[in-house]
Amino acid sequence: EQYFWLTIPVKSKGKYNQLINQVEIDYSKDPFEKIVKILKHNYSRCKYYSEIIEILEKIFKKKILYLSELNILLIQEICKFLKIEGKKFIKSSNLNISSKKGQLLFDITQMLNGNIYISADGSGIFFNNQNPFKDTSIVLKYHNYDHPKYKQKSKKFIEYCSIVDLLFNEGIKSRKKFKNYEI
């Protein structure tokens, strides 16, 4: 009945200013062995454990070099499992844009012909009091997350766990938690 952090070790020595797409996973020890043990300990009695751990272990065995690539693959595989189809993933590193912070977000939205940029609530500090979306046709919306409740193994519901928690507990039924969701 407690939450825990799952972390993946990365190579960081002398790499303080690296871009997110340059962060390498540290394979000097098996970075996923501990994660799988923690997941087994905490979720093995969940109804959908076998199904979800199989997806995760398949991904972990791929020896993906960069953390961003691992994140992308995890998102894609979760979308596939939940039958969320027709979504295109575009890496900002492939767009040849050199601006920074809030301006970068605006430039990406504009380059992709977006008319709305959805930002996490509380991320206004990222714009440093200079809102590049102001006085443009692109609308900046702040996403205020209202956490859905679902059946968990614990007696008391623990909010703000990752989608992995939801998947272990609800499996494909997790789709219902997103069906009527609006921003």
What are these regions (language model features)?
Residues 1-183:
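Residues lining hydrophobic/aromatic ligand-binding pockets adjacent to catalytic sites
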